[in-house]
């Protein structure tokens, strides 16, 4: 193990030996002279974050953009790819097997710029499910065959739970239930997009998600280092022996043993490297001209499958719970959304306990669920999430919050029908009343990224998000416009709707299966 840890001199591990910088006083930066409930809350939350999560990046006005639609996201991806000079680094669950246009765009960029290097990180189970037919891995293999693994480094993460009898007996269609690489990071030189969207046609056309573009070299470097670290725990696609085939190996350069050979040792080595990354990054960057930075961004991630069971150093879950615990006044409103609504019980309890006057939960209508009218077992998933929505409403009543908390279903046509959309957005917004309009709530905090805030997100998958806290009025307007864009396709749902609408009836079998398999949803 000592020998492996000494290998940190390799380029993508040098981050672990960066000199620590003097912490920056976040409270001083964000404090306002005005002792309003909003100002007081900002002081409280920034103090809490400073104590518990000091990895922080500072942004000026216009350094964060919010993309509204799938088509805008796709156009931006292609533009950024073609304009990249030094690096492209992408982490996603999968690359759609028909996304030849995107692959051609990357190929064009590599041909145009000989200095450009591309790094891909996908999930190894989802990305190889269709083998030997076309899939994510075969598309990436074509790039490696053309440009070599020195310029195109394609990695496939496979959960360490995928070993032993599970590897042999669990069918391909269901092995994703063991755990996934679920991060969505799209980096181009000194910019990075954080999103919940994957790379396939529906995410580029009619599957609503969220997308934030961050323009910062330091922020981009952080996510590049994270990308490279998780890639070093993953398999690599190298040049195929025969044209049209695929060649996947565990590189000798990886700093850990292959998980299928020694799972316990793999977890020990991977967790030490992750812990080192989180500790080495746990300082604010030195900056000048404090007053010009009106926005703070905290990276938060969940790497539970790579940590020992009782020594999880992940930052997302504890940060979300801490954030919600600071809401002690009805001067703050919140909105929570997840397309797959299986909210972690701890988060649900925190939300229900907040003393809010107004709050919204947005989830997908059964007609906007990507599994609507799918084949096989997955056809029951919309019913499962419907059942979980009903249970949430029952909990709202139990907490006597039905006057304040509204469940809203998002629907835009019917998925898989002409002009029909599906819903995949996820996130949290905290809002304060507009100083010029007391009836108008405007966000000042949001969480953006890959997590659905489910039980599986905090136990089985790799997730990466960012918590944004801002006083920038222009950014707050953009955040409100983003939220309004989601809300315009929603309608409130009550327990009475479940009682009166026969289409909301969920069979006993689905209820039982949901209770048993809830951790996998």
Curated annotation (Swiss-Prot):
One of its GO terms (biological process) is cardiolipin biosynthetic process. InterPro entries: PGS1, PLipase_D/transphosphatidylase. It is found in: Mitochondrion. CDD domains: PLDc_PGS1_euk_1, PLDc_PGS1_euk_2. It catalyses: a CDP-1,2-diacyl-sn-glycerol + sn-glycerol 3-phosphate = a 1,2-diacyl-sn-glycero-3-phospho-(1'-sn-glycero-3'-phosphate) + CMP + H(+). The keyword Transferase applies. Induction: Repressed by inositol and choline. The active site is at residues 182, 184, 189. It comes from the Eukaryota. Its EC number is 2.7.8.5. Keywords: ATP-binding, Lipid biosynthesis, Lipid metabolism, Mitochondrion, Nucleotide-binding, Phospholipid biosynthesis, Phospholipid metabolism, Repeat, Transferase. Residues 177-203, 419-457 form the PLD phosphodiesterase domain. One of its GO terms (molecular function) is CDP-diacylglycerol-glycerol-3-phosphate 3-phosphatidyltransferase activity. Pathway: Phospholipid metabolism; phosphatidylglycerol biosynthesis; phosphatidylglycerol from CDP-diacylglycerol: step 1/2. GO terms for cellular component: mitochondrion. ATP binds at residues 91-98. Belongs to the CDP-alcohol phosphatidyltransferase class-II family. Essential for the viability of mitochondrial petite mutant. Catalyzes the committed step to the synthesis of the acidic phospholipids. This is CDP-diacylglycerol--glycerol-3-phosphate 3-phosphatidyltransferase. It comes from Saccharomyces cerevisiae (strain ATCC 204508 / S288c) (Baker's yeast).
């Amino acid at each position: 193990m000592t020998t492996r840890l000494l290998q940190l001199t390799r380029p993508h591990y040098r981050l672990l030996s960066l000199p620590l910088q003097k912490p920056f006083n976040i409270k001083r930066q964000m404090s306002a002279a005005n002792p309003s409930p909003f100002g007081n809350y900002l002081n409280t939350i920034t103090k809490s974050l400073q104590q518990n999560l000091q990895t922080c990046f500072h942004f000026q006005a216009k350094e964060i953009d919010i993309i509204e639609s799938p088509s805008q996201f796709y156009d931006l991806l292609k533009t950024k790819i073609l304009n990249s000079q030094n690096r492209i680094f992408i982490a996603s669950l999968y690359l759609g097997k028909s996304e030849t246009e995107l692959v051609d765009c990357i190929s064009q960029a590599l041909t145009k710029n000989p200095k450009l290097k591309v790094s891909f990180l996908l999930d190894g189970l989802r990305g190889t499910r269709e083998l030997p037919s076309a899939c994510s891995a075969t598309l990436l293999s074509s790039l490696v065959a053309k440009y070599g693994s020195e310029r195109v480094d394609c990695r496939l993460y496979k959960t360490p739970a995928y070993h032993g009898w599970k590897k042999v007996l669990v069918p391909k269609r269901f092995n994703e239930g063991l755990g996934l690489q679920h991060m969505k990071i799209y980096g181009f030189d000194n910019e990075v997009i954080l999103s919940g969207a994957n790379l396939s046609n529906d995410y580029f056309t009619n599957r609503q998600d969220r997308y934030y573009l961050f323009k910062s070299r330091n922020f981009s470097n952080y996510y590049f280092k994270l990308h490279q670290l998780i890639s070093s725990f993953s398999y690599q696609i190298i040049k195929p022996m025969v044209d049209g085939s695929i060649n996947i190996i565990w590189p000798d350069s990886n700093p850990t043993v292959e998980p299928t050979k020694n799972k316990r040792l793999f977890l020990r080595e991977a967790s030490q490297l992750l812990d080192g990354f989180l500790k080495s990054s746990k300082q604010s960057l030195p900056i000048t001209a404090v007053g010009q930075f009106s926005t703070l961004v905290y990276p938060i991630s969940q790497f539970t499958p790579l940590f020992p069971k009782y020594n999880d150093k992940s930052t997302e879950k504890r940060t979300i719970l801490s954030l919600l615990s600071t809401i002690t006044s009805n001067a703050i409103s919140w909105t929570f959304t997840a397309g797959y609504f299986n909210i972690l019980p701890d988060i649900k309890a925190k939300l229900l306990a907040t003393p809010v006057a107004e709050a919204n939960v947005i989830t997908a209508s059964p007609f906007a669920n990507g599994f609507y009218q799918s084949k096989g077992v997955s056809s029951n998933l919309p019913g499962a999430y419907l059942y979980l929505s009903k249970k949430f409403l029952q909990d709202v009543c139990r907490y006597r919050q039905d006057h304040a908390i509204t469940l809203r279903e998002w629907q835009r046509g019917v998925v898989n029908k002409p002009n029909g959309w599906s819903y995949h957005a996820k996130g949290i917004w905290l809002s304060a009343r507009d100083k010029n309009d007391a009836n108008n709530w405007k966000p000042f905090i949001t969480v953006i990224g890959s997590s659905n805030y489910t039980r599986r997100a905090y136990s089985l998958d790799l997730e990466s998000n960012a918590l944004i806290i801002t006083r920038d009025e222009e950014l707050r307007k953009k955040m409100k416009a983003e939220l309004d864009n989601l809300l315009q396709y929603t309608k409130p749902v009550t327990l009475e709707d479940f009682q009166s609408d026969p289409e909301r009836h969920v069979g006993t079998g689905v209820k039982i299966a949901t209770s048993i398999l809830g951790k996998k949803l």
